[in-house]
From Swiss-Prot:
GO cellular component, one term: endoplasmic reticulum tubular network
Keyword Phosphoprotein among record annotations: yes
Membrane-related topology note: Multi-pass membrane protein
The species this protein was found in: Bos taurus
Keyword set, alphabetical order: Membrane, Phosphoprotein, Transmembrane, Transmembrane helix
Name listed for the protein in its UniProt record: Receptor expression-enhancing protein 2
Region of interest: Disordered: 164-254
């Protein structure tokens, strides 16, 4: 454990921070020799970091593994050994020169495939997100409509309960609630006989109003009243009376 901590400190301080500062100085002074030296070091150190990630998993159990790693980093940095320059000239540069074209082709193919994969995955992700948003909105709308429906039913029950209670007017008398009046009006509206009567009653005032309106607009003509002569009682018919025959006494006396 102690050797692992020491090796990590050595790699961070001597393998990363010190070369980074030296590279800054080389860029600042525009010293081509130092610039080339530290560029070779960073190329070798990149391969070392990649190999270290694998060897820490596989060879960490090996005795003196971390001590050997510390010694290797010091060998790379030492101005006497110039390990980074030796490794670059003998191994790294010849290998990269032989495989440069293949590496470039792999890089271009990987870039194109990664771009296509990213576009495909992005489109699929957008479709999934849109579908999820639509389903969530539909579910939310359904829940909201159910809640509104439940609230409306509760309000209706409350209104019916309030309608059942009689209201007391200012004069102390009980009066029907407006809800009950509405119910009775609806019931009367449903009755066909009452609807017919109401239709006739509604039609009569219109005619009366129209006649009154016409009377107001055009003055009525007053017909002169003719005096009807009173019928005279019929003359009594004279009864024809037959003359009485003279009595026979007068004849006898003659």
């Amino acid at each position: 454990m102690v050797s692992w901590i020491i090796s990590r400190l050595v790699v961070l301080i001597f393998g990363t921070l010190y070369p980074a500062y030296s590279s800054y100085k080389a860029v600042k002074t525009k010293n081509v020799k130092e610039y080339v030296k530290w560029m070779m070091y960073w190329i070798v150190f990149a391969f070392f970091t990649t190999a270290e990630t694998l060897t820490d998993i596989v060879l960490s159990w090996f005795p003196f593994y971390f001590e050997l790693k510390i010694a290797f980093v010091i060998w790379l940095l030492s101005p006497y050994t110039k390990g980074s320059s030796v490794l670059y000239r003998k191994f790294v540069h010849p290998t990269l020169s032989n495989k440069e074209k293949e590496i470039d082709e792999y890089i271009t193919q990987a870039r194109d495939k990664s771009y296509e994969t990213m576009m495909r995955v992005g489109k699929r992700g957008l479709n999934l997100a849109a579908n999820a948003a639509v389903t969530a909105a539909a579910k939310g709308q359904g829940v909201l409509s159910e809640k509104l429906r439940s609230f409306s039913m509760q309000d209706l029950t409350l209104i019916r309960d309030e309608d059942a209670l009689p209201l007391q007017g200012p004069d102390g008398r009980l009066r029907a609630s407006p809800g009950s009046l509405l119910d009775t009006i609806e019931d009367l509206g449903d009755d066909p006989t009452l609807s017919v009567r109401s239709g006739t009653n509604q039609a009569d005032p219109r005619t009366e109003i129209s006649e009154d309106d016409t009377g107001d607009k055009a003055p009525k003509r007053v017909k002169p009243i003719k005096k009807v002569p009173k019928p005279e009682p019929p003359a009594s018919k004279t009864l024809k009376t037959r003359p009485k025959k003279k009595t026979s006494a007068g004849g006898d006396s003659a």
